[in-house]
């Protein structure tokens, strides 16, 4: 019924829009191309996708920006500072460390204020395991297609009371129907360093200060050493990190697929700290019966190894005597310098910061597997009526070890220390 010469606009969620000039034809056959890039008008709201203008709650959707993403060890780094009302505070800044996420501030003084995290339709347990305190650390940032944040109380209508602090919905990348097999590699190298040091006295300044304050013949002056040690320089380093990802994607008949593996190795600027992660993901999305039956299978696995540095070494480096050496050959403490009085270790004295890092070994190893299968069926006699089934699991195990020998300033009094702890969790949907 459109008049001749008029322009007909055709659009659909997930496809490129087309404008067609009516030449007077009685019938038009229009084929829309899939558009996986333009997602500004589409948001995921828990039970499907809608246009942003049709969403009734407070919703923010973003896509990861490869051109301006910075150093992204975890998924948390990708949204930090990019969504209004979402505040992220990292726990110490070590590679792979946890983070506190708050959507529109905290709502409880005693209960949890953590938002609910949903990955490909599967709610994830917010309780971390040994080695991975942040559930967003378990997913490879390279696999993420979109973030959607539900900020207000309307999210509780979908997910219940768990969503009272907001919801972070993560949609991972998928293959494209009918596309040819494609293999891609994405890699980067990063360098991290501290920008400045805490201003403290150098060795000569400290000697002059002690001499002027207590006198040249005082016992305090006799305790001074002959070295010139920059303790902050001894514990910090320029850290190098690498990230590698290989992806195979395509569409086999009516079954789009995507398989990816990733490896991340990030050293911390505090010596001995290190985060290493292996990830793998599989997505299959076959459709049957002229797209009336759609199946979406997702599986993501992660293995991480984390070496924790003793952050107490930072305070010790600021306070330690710069005239003392890092090592003095004392076998009682593994060769490291330590304060003594008449040959006895002074337990209340500031400990050697380098020894705190090198002689304390605290490591965590964790494994995580998240998977779900969604089955969606549109009835032939009434396409608006759908049956949807979502089955999923979230399994994780984490082990943390701590050890320092008795021949160390840390372990001299306690005759050394060793510890071991394991946490397992299993959740089914």
Locate the predicted segments by residue.
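Outer-membrane beta-barrel transmembrane strands
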Residues: 237-255, 261-264, 347-402, 421-429
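Short coil/turn segments at secondary-structure junctions
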Residues: 62, 232, 356-360, 416-420
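A surface-exposed, glycine/aromatic-enriched loop/edge motif typical of exported proteins
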Residues: 193, 197-198, 203-214, 302-344, ...
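Short, small/polar-rich motifs associated with maturation and membrane association
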Residues: 1-302, 310, 370-371
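Small-side-chain secondary-structure face that scaffolds active or pore-lining regions
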Residues: 178, 268-281, 296-302, 308-313, ...
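Glycine/serine-rich loop-strand microenvironments at binding/catalytic pocket rims
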Residues: 290-295, 316-365, 378-394, 400-415
């Amino acid at each position: 019924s459109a008049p001749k010469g008029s322009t007909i606009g055709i659009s659909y969620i997930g496809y490129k829009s087309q404008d067609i000039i009516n030449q007077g034809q009685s019938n038009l056959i229009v084929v829309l191309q899939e558009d996986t890039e333009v997602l500004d008008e589409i948001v995921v709201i828990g039970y499907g996708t809608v246009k942003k203008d049709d969403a009734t709650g407070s919703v923010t959707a973003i896509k990861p920006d490869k051109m301006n993403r910075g150093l992204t060890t975890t998924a948390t780094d990708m949204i930090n500072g990019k969504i209004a009302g979402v505040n992220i505070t990292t726990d110490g800044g070590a590679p792979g460390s946890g983070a506190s996420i708050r959507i529109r501030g905290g709502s409880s003084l005693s209960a949890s204020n953590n938002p609910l995290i949903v990955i490909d339709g599967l709610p994830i347990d917010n309780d971390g395991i040994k080695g991975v305190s942040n559930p967003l650390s378990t997913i490879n940032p390279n696999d993420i297609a979109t973030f959607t944040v539900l900020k207000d109380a309307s999210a509780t209508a979908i997910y219940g009371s768990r969503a009272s602090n907001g919801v972070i919905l993560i949609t991972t990348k998928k293959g494209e129907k009918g596309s040819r097999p494609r293999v891609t590699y994405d890699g980067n190298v990063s360098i991290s360093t501290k920008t400045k040091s805490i201003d403290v006295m150098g060795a000569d300044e400290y000697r002059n200060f002690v001499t002027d304050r207590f006198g040249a013949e005082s016992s305090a002056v006799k305790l001074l050493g002959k070295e010139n040690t920059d303790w902050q320089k001894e514990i910090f380093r320029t850290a190098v990190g690498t990230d590698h990802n290989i992806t195979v994607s395509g569409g086999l008949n009516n079954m789009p697929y995507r398989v990816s593996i990733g490896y991340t190795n990030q050293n911390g600027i505090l010596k001995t700290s290190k985060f290493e992660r292996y990830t793998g993901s599989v997505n299959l999305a076959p459709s049957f019966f002229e797209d009336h039956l759609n199946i979406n299978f997702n599986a993501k696995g992660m293995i991480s190894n984390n070496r924790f540095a003793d952050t107490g070494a930072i305070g010790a480096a600021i306070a330690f005597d710069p005239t003392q050496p890092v090592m003095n050959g004392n076998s009682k403490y593994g060769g490291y310098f330590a304060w003594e009085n008449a040959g006895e270790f002074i337990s209340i004295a500031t400990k050697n910061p380098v020894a705190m890092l090198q002689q304390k070994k605290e490591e965590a190893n964790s494994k995580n597997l998240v998977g779900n299968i969604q089955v969606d069926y549109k009835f032939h006699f009434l396409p608006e009526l759908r049956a949807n089934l979502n089955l999923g699991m979230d399994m994780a195990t984490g082990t943390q070890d701590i050890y320092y020998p008795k021949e160390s300033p840390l372990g001299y009094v306690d005759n050394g220390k060793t510890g071991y702890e394991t946490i397992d969790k299993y959740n089914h949907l």
